[in-house]
Amino acid sequence: MSPELQPLMRRTTRRSALIGVVAIVAAGALAACGGNDKASTAADGTTAVTVLRSTGSTFEPLYIAEEQGFFKQAGLTVTIKAGAQDTSQNAPSVLNGEAQFAMTDSSGFLKAAAQKLPVRIVSNLQAATTKTAPSDGLLVKKGSSIKSYADLEGKTVGLSALGGTLQFICEYSTKQAGGDPSKIKFVALPLTSLNDAVLQGKVDAVYTFATFLDAGKAAGLTAIGIGTNALPGLSQALLFSSQSWLAKNAATAKKFTDAMSKAFDYANAHPEAVRAVDTKYTKLPADYIKNRSIQEFSAPIDTGVMQTVITDMVNFGLLKQAPDSNSILWSQAATTTNSQ
């Protein structure tokens, strides 16, 4: 293994752990201060809310709701802003009232909930499903001895970030294949360097997604498994808010989630609208936008899958403790137990 990969193994480095602790302490202090929990009114009399989106994608329904007038019909003026690159760091902005809603993924949210931050999921955005082709996955060199996730024992896997959903699904898939996830060495590398790392033999495999997955295949790498689709219902993107704001603004929150549900239906029926948002707001290559498989958007959170994720994240050491089951979902959030 090359020297630059040595320190970053299964868990975060001392520096990243310290940053995480500081962020959590700061968020806790902000929560104690209460923030501004009163919904503000825009100049036209509508209720003003701010949403922090991801910097990648999966935020398309937010812009569709704006463009199709679903927010306006609900009496809302919604400001959509790019949030933190690591969406798990959006919690402080929600807790201090800078934003009323923010995006993250299941692992990012559960880490906040496990630290007893007063945040609640209000809606899913997108979940893993067997209905569409995988948009993420494990890549190995052609001719590699790795033929299934079980073969990852004793191997080094490159990821763009440690401790998140991609590491979770890699460990989950290994466990499901009969392997021991604790015997995998995970290393963090720049997303743009992952494919080269496995091609050059610096790592045995990489877990990547979107256009980088396609580029890896085009470069001769072999995909193993079906990515996050191995756990249908796994929330890949969701929206959350603060418990205190929701308690005082339940009607506004319901208007927002209802408008988002309309946007989900519209996006699912009009994939060209999703591609248009990608073209305008992402840096994805034009060819990828034109040809990519667009996954279904949906509001319900699969509670059974969420419990599986919690249990396994604790077992894998990705969560120090399980969050209180009553501190995860907003009381009016849509749920399901029948993901496919």
Predicted regions and their residues:
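N-terminal secretory signal peptides
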Residues: 1-11, 21-26
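Pocket-lining segment of extracytoplasmic ligand-binding domains
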Residues: 107, 187, 192-277
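N-terminal export leaders
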Residues: 13-18, 198
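C-terminal motif of bacterial Sec signal peptides marking the signal peptidase cleavage site
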Residues: 28-32
